[in-house]
Amino acid sequence: MASPDDPLRSDHMAKEPVEDTDPSTLSFAMSDKYPIQDTGLPKAKECDTVNSNCPPNSDDQPQGEENDFPDSTKDPLSGVSRNQPCKDRKGSCSCPSCSPRAPTISDLLNDQDLLDTIRIKLDPCHPTVKNWRNFASKWGMPYDELCFLEQRPQSPTLEFLFRNSQRTVGQLMELCRLYHRADVEKILRRWVDEEWPHRGHSDSSMHF
């Protein structure tokens, strides 16, 4: 075994390359091959140059002017009058201004002749014929209230109609069909078809 002072061993070690582990020399050598990128923030002048060359952000545009449409918050129908009377004087127009609204029971209360006819039809009590009690019970009137109205001298049918004046005549006609009172439905149908169009038009003309 060769000793540390062996001249052959010393000669062999002199021929082998020695690795340089000095970090300072390594960093200089790597910087020559791979330049270090500057990741710092751009200078003020560079920022001004970049901003001047960049197009404006689309998000900064006024929202009302996107796609070349003018900014407007007005009602598109503001220039159109919704309550303009119809100019057709022939009576054949079917526009909303000329068409009468759906009649309510409160409209029936203005026709005394019609009320008298309905009262005569619905006031009497018959064992097999439905009357005002069935109508009122169907629309939610309690039993005690039914008995109370029946004892009063006034017509219970008229009282029933007064308490349901906001309902439509169409709903009242449905009750007539439900309880097979075709005689009352026929009276109401004739009034809706013949009398109400004139009354409805006169009521509409009062608004103009």
From Swiss-Prot:
Keyword Cytoplasm belongs to the record: yes
GO molecular function ontology, one term from the record: death receptor binding
Effect of residue 145 to K: Reduces binding to EDAR
GO cellular component terms given for this protein: cytoplasm
Sequence ranges of Basic and acidic residues compositional bias: 1-18
GO biological process, one term: odontogenesis of dentin-containing tooth
Subcellular compartments: Cytoplasm
Quaternary organization: Binds EDAR. Self-associates and binds TRAF1, TRAF2 and TRAF3.
Role of this protein: Adapter protein that interacts with EDAR DEATH domain and couples the receptor to EDA signaling pathway during morphogenesis of ectodermal organs. Mediates the activation of NF-kappa-B.
Full protein name: Ectodysplasin-A receptor-associated adapter protein
Source organism of this protein record: Mus musculus (Mouse)
Gene: Edaradd
